[in-house]
Amino acid sequence: MKIGIVGLGFVGLSLTSVLASKGYNTVGIDVDKEKCGKISNGNSPFFEPNLEKILRNGLKKKLAVS
């Protein structure tokens, strides 16, 4: 199963990161290319405890950002 999340703001990025870190094939989509670039490099555009750790774990597993 592939899951697509449109909008990588606070809720979208958190949800996308957790789903991917749990092993779901996940695609996060956002119109802001600069934000997508940061996220693809494992950097969150905002602070949430442990989010960057979860994001990087998801990127290693099954997370794509577009």
Locate each region found by the language model.
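Structural/interface elements that position substrates and couple domains in central-metabolism enzymes
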Residues: 1-66
